[in-house]
């Protein structure tokens, strides 16, 4: 990684993308006395953590469940005085449509102890922000990795939720790195602290986007509805051209996946090669009213999470409000098939799909394949940090969970953008992480 030049004075930084990672890095930079402009193509902030209101209720379209591992998010919520509430209960709907509890055999059959020993031996830094530190050790396809280590009950206990959350099916060739990171972030593998008075999972009252709007409101320069047309990087700075005019800066932070920004970036051969290797999942959120379905819970559909052969069918749905039949449904697959397959799935469960309010498609979980991980793709991405005055945050270097992207973005800002001269102090972030201590 390149070190910043002339770090004594305030830097000017353009941040492209106003999702959680972009807003988190912008907040850190402003807190350290730097001048930041955030550019967002959409009309609102929050990225994949958007919320909408229907019938007087807030519905989250993407990320919103927080576990006891979400310490950075909890700190943000506390600092900004954002109200939280417990999440809905989790249930699995089996092939017959019966609601059952998720199997927790992994925590009781001795596999957890074997996993902890394996973790200590081969990937001890997996819980730290970022992925590069553990990528080579966990590059094998998840199914093969589970079989090689005799952790079949780990798949039984975490596979349904993993697939329902948009990360793929366990019979695909997705590397074990991502499955293990997900399992760690559930908070079930190791006891964690009670956060914000919640003994279990929690979320934001009134929609998760409330938090990101609050973050954006305290920043000095957030511009929504602005399309970046090109990024020009020079030895003396960066010029980000937009449909509203150019933005001059010392540095640019790309809070969107490299393959998404590539068409407007004056990319190097190395950047182009890495971008060409990025994969993502076509994941859909459908907000719709449906009657006759199990209520009051977050339901995982076992028949559609067990194998990639069921791709396109609904993998989960969330019924959050007792006085509303509106639910959020989640599925993979082709956009033109999602609604028709959802109608069939609801009917098969004994329900009826009523009004469809909206459908949102995400390029979810940007990641590298196993061969690329083994060959050091994430190390190569890390080596690009700061080069050509460019920094990368988001799901690709961090993993597509909001706590992971925020922690990685915060740590990047703290390590590489020291407080400007004359800045009294950063916000109180509490004790340094292990990763931060290694950098000092």
Provide a role label for each language-model segment.
Residues 229-341:
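Mid-domain catalytic core of redox enzymes
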Residues 185-237, 242:
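Helical element adjacent to the flavin cofactor pocket in flavoenzyme catalytic cores
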């Amino acid at each position: 990684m390149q070190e910043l030049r002339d770090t004594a004075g305030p830097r000017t930084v353009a941040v492209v993308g106003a999702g959680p990672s972009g807003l988190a890095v912008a907040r850190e930079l402003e807190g350290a006395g730097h001048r930041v402009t955030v550019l967002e193509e959409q009309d609102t902030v929050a990225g994949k953590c958007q919320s909408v209101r229907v019938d007087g209720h807030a519905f989250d379209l993407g990320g919103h469940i927080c576990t006891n591992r979400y310490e950075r998010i909890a700190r943000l919520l506390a600092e900004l005085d954002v109200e939280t509430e417990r999440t809905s209960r989790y249930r699995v709907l089996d092939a017959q449509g019966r609601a059952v509890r998720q199997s927790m055999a992994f925590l009781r059959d001795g596999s957890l102890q074997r996993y902890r020993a394996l973790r200590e031996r081969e990937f001890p830094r997996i819980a730290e922000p970022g992925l590069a530190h553990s990528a080579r050790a966990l590059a094998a396809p998840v199914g093969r990795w589970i079989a090689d280590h005799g952790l079949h009950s780990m798949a039984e206990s975490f596979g349904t939720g993993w697939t329902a959350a948009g990360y793929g099916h366990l019979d695909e060739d997705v590397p074990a790195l991502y499955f293990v990171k997900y399992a760690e972030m559930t908070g079930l593998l190791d006891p964690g602290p009670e956060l914000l008075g919640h003994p279990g999972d929690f979320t934001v009252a009134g929609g998760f986007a409330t938090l990101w709007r609050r973050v954006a409101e305290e920043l000095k320069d957030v511009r929504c509805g602005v399309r970046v047309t090109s990024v020009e990087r020079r030895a003396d700075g960066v010029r980000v051209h937009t449909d509203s005019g150019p933005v001059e800066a010392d540095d640019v932070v790309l809070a969107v996946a490299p393959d998404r920004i590539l068409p407007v970036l004056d990319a190097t051969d190395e950047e182009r090669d890495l971008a060409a290797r990025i994969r993502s999942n076509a994941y859909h959120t459908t907000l719709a009213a449906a009657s006759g379905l199990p209520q009051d819970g977050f339901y995982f559909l076992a028949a559609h999470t067990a194998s990639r052969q069921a791709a396109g069918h609904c993998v989960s749905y969330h019924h959050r409000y007792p006085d509303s039949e509106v639910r959020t449904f989640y599925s993979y697959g082709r956009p033109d098939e999602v609604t028709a397959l959802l109608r069939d799935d609801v009917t098969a469960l004994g329900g009826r799909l009523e009004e469809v309010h909206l459908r949102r498609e995400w390029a979810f979980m940007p990641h590298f394949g196993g061969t690329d991980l083994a060959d050091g793709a994430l190390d190569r991405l890390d080596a690009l940090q700061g080069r050509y005055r460019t920094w990368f945050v988001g799901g690709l270097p961090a993993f597509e969970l909001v706590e992971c992207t925020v922690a990685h973005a915060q740590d990047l800002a703290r390590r590489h953008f020291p407080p400007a001269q004359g800045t009294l102090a950063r916000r109180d972030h509490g004790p340094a992480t292990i990763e931060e201590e290694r950098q000092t």
